[in-house]
């Protein structure tokens, strides 16, 4: 206990603790700097999409998140070739390619091949030499109408099945999720 009329001490600080304090006074300026950098990059890479290259749809790992899908790093070589593209050429037309990625399911492969084909159908490819256009090059009037895409390229949506409300059956009332998971 305290003896006499002494102060109750609570301040157990280390020496020079003020130098170790982390402050966030630069947060609004950093936010503005990031915004300006995004804007500058969009102007620099125009007329390419501002959000960057097309990325694949991948399933999230682990038991907790495996019902969700998100964008991956890049398409596998198998997916790119199945869509009728050369991996080296695909990188030049705004498709991210990851040579390390492997396809573990046929459904995932088909989903990303369809994504690549949809991208290829919507793509406006500027000719390197307008006098000698290549096979995939766009026409002159399409090139004039082309604008930069500001939002994500082919945005990914969660596939959620909508169920209609119904009266629970006797088997549904007897069902226990805990016991079902424990038995697996």
From Swiss-Prot:
A GO molecular-function descriptor: structural constituent of ribosome
Stored Pfam families: Ribosomal_L13e (PF01294)
Compositionally biased residues, Basic residues: 31-42
Keyword ATP-binding: no
Swiss-Prot/TrEMBL keywords: Ribonucleoprotein, Ribosomal protein
Any one GO biological process: translation
Signal peptide per UniProt: none
GO cellular component, one term: cytosolic large ribosomal subunit
Spans annotated as Disordered: 28-53
Family: Belongs to the eukaryotic ribosomal protein eL13 family.
Protein name as catalogued: Large ribosomal subunit protein eL13
């Amino acid at each position: 206990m305290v003896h006499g009329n002494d102060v109750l001490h609570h301040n157990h600080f280390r020496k020079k603790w003020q130098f170790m304090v982390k402050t966030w006074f630069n947060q609004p300026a950093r936010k503005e700097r990031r915004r300006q950098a995004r804007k500058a990059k969009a102007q620099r890479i125009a007329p390419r999409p501002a959000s960057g290259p097309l990325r694949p749809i991948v399933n999230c790992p682990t038991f907790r998140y495996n019902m969700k899908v998100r964008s991956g790093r890049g398409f596998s070589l198998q997916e790119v070739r199945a869509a009728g593209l050369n991996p080296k050429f695909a990188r030049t037309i705004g498709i991210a390619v990851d040579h390390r990625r492997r396809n573990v399911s046929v459904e995932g492969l088909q989903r990303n091949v369809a994504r690549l084909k949809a991208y290829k159908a919507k793509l406006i490819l500027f000719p390197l030499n307008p006098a000698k256009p290549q096979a995939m090059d766009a026409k002159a009037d399409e090139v004039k109408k082309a604008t930069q895409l500001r939002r994500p390229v082919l945005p990914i949506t969660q596939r959620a099945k909508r169920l209609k409300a119904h009266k629970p059956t006797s088997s549904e009332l007897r069902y226990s999720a805990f016991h079902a998971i424990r038995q697996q």
